[in-house]
Each structure stands twice: as structure tokens, then as C-alpha cells.
């Protein structure tokens, strides 16, 4: 225990002091601008979706509204008069402004706490003289790594990272990094007063995309802090269970994405793959015996060891969440399977190891004999059933996969409706371009195409056949995928038509930094 405490203190020696009054002063915005945290800096800047509008807000707008709240003694009236709580928004006459205020406050808080991580990240890159590799942020970059290493491993463990059941857990985690007590009290006050915080912390749906739009950035930061704490302890356990010790470990935050790097001895090292923070931070832990990867709230632990070793790590995780984070985690939520006999669902794909047997006849002089060879191949497949369930939740089809119309989009123009359906189809095909069998993906395209036709027919009070005949090739072209067009340029003879030809070619794109939204609904 003393060794663990010393490990914490050593890593957290850079605990950050924050100035609470900066939240309501101009200095914080000048500091953010000078440090390159605005649009031009591209370190933290993320366009903020204004509730109820299609336009984007700016840092100046955040400053203006927070200053306005401060001048109106907003917090004082919120605390003293709970029956007329402007912050929550239920009793305020203008619901838009109450939600908008909470959005601006959460943005201001996130800007403050992100600054030290940004400065640490910039100084690290300058110190190491390394260039940021945006390719490593791609979700697809993990699959070539798995394709290369999983062929020689035995067991895989599926882990669902539990959600914190109380906001105090997240505040206590931040308390380890932040010295400013008033700022922590402010965070507690904000979370208690915010009307939608229950939908994030206590929910039956395990998707973290239940955040409301106006505070998503703040909750992503809090969730990433929690996940980092989990993996911080996991690294500690891993370091003390390995014969080859790690030489250094650093973790950073870029925008709201955690970055990390480990430098090891010759036979082991750590690769960190980053994507859209909680739209999907992805880690890959590599050594000669164990591999760890996480995308969003799901992780896999793959090992060459025995089933007993995997059970050991399973109970390590259970004890970690039970005794350190103080909430119960059922051990049955961690599944241990043999790679050669089971597939696992990770990052939107069903992955498995396929064994192919081939026989070769060899002849030497007058003797001939047969040689049986067994090869193992890493295979990725589209989870068709999961995608259909996701489409049904998004009201594109029924649970059985029967396409239905999307009446909520009937207010758009015909070209707008076609463009939306086509964009969803292209994004799905782009993300699942690494599948070796794409017949299931063609079924998803068919559902979206027919749902688009039903939506247009319902808008004009006509039949589906009429619109299919009227649009013809135009509707079909909207559902051509970029991946198929790229593949047709690479292999023009193999693909005479985008929907026909070679459907076993796999393409991994290194520009995908977030998992598609339909998979997030699962």
C-alpha cells in the first residue's frame, strides 16, 4: 500500500493550482488566446454546438455570457431561491437561456482545467522533438496491430468499464490533480443544480452519449479523468506483474483526448492510439505476453497465458472498482473466451481467428507425400444484427430490419433528405471498409435507401415505386461509398461496378477519429 501511495504521489507531483476568480475575469480568455487554445491553436478548440441553433459559438461568446451571469448575481439568486431556479431551467420563463447558461458555464470550466494539460502536452513534444502523428489517432490503426499480434495469442477478455454511480467519485478524482478547493465546490454545485446530470450518472443505457449537447464537453472531460484513473491503476498493477519493468510513463491531454507514451526495454513497449475522446479514446497495450486495447467504454485484454492468468486479471479489475472506486462491479460482466473458438465484438467489428487447412503434394525422387498445413488469419466482419438494432433505435427500420420512413425529416428539401441518408450510408461504409465480407453491409445500404424512398414518398403523399422510378440513378449514386470508389481506383479491373465485384478487399483508413454514431446507440 505504501508503494502504491508513493507511486501516486510521484506521478501527481504536478498537481495544478487553479484560480477560481479567473472564471469570471477577462484574464482567463486572454491566457487562452495567447496560449493558442482558440481556433488557430487547434490544441483544444472544438466548435461548440449552441442549443437550438446550427451556428457555432466562440470563446468571446463564452466570456460575454459568463460575465453577464456574474453581473446579474446569477449564482446568488440560484442558491437563495430554489423555487425560481434559473439554473435548472424548469421554472424559468425562457427555457433556451437557462440551458444556454449552463452550456456557457460548463465551457468556461472546461477551458480552465484543460489549460495545464495543453501546456504539458506542448512542452513534452518540444522536449522530445517528436511530431504528432494524427494517424495514430485513427480507430482503424488498432486493427492492423491486432491483425499482426493476435495470431499467436490464446485468450481474450471482454471488459465493460463501469460508469460511476455518483458524481462525487469524479470530483474526488479531480481533487487529486487540482489544488483549488473553491473550483471543486463550484463543480459540485454545477453538477447538483444541472437538471440532466441523472441521465449521465444513473442510467440503464450504457452509452455515454446520453450527455445533453450543452454540457457534453465537460462530461467528456470528467469521464476521461475517471477512465484515466482506472488505467493508471492498471498500469501500476501491470508494472509490478512484469519481469521487464517500464522505464517511464507519461499521459497527456490534447483537446479532450488523452495521449500517452511509454518507453520500455527492448522487448516491450506501449502504443497509445487516440481518437475522439469519449467519442472514443483508444489504447493499445503491447508486450510479449499481454495486449490491452480500449475504445470508449469497452476494453479487451488478450494474452498468450493460461485461463488461470486471465481469471487473475479479471478479479484484479473487480477488486479495483470495488475497493478503490467504492461501487460494486459484477464479475460476470467480464467474459474470458478462447480466441480460436470465439469471436469478440470490439470497435464496431466482430473479430475472430479463422483457421484454413491446405494440403500440398510434395514429390522427392520416386517418393511422394502429402503435407497438411494449417494457417491462421485475423478476420473482421460487420455486425449486421447490431447495426439493424441500431437503425431501429434511430427509427430507420423495424427491429426485424423492415425499412420505415423518417417523418421527422420531411420538413427538409428532397435534396436535403437524400443527402442525409447518403451521408449516413457513406459513413457506415467508410468505417466498415475493413470487413472481409461486405454482403451484410449491402443489406444496411438497402435499408437506408428504401427508408429514404419511403420518407420522400410520405412527404409528397405518393408511393415508393413512383419515387424510385423518378429518381432512378440519382438516388443510387448518393449511396455509392467513398471506400468503394477508392477501391475501384486501386483495383479498376476487379470492380466493374461499385456494388459488385471484389467484396473481400479490406481497407483501413487512418483518418477516422470517431466511431460512427449508429454504433454508439448499442
UniProtKB/Swiss-Prot annotation:
The keyword tRNA processing applies. This is Maturase K. The keyword Glycoprotein does not apply. It is found in: Plastid, Chloroplast. Its main location: plastid. Pfam families: Intron_maturas2 (PF01348), MatK_N (PF01824). Belongs to the intron maturase 2 family. MatK subfamily. Usually encoded in the trnK tRNA gene intron. Probably assists in splicing its own and other chloroplast group II introns. InterPro entries: Domain_X, Maturase_MatK, Maturase_MatK_N. One of its GO terms (molecular function) is RNA binding. Coiled coil: none annotated. Keywords: Chloroplast, mRNA processing, Plastid, RNA-binding, tRNA processing. One of its GO terms (biological process) is mRNA processing. One of its GO terms (cellular component) is chloroplast. It comes from the Eukaryota.
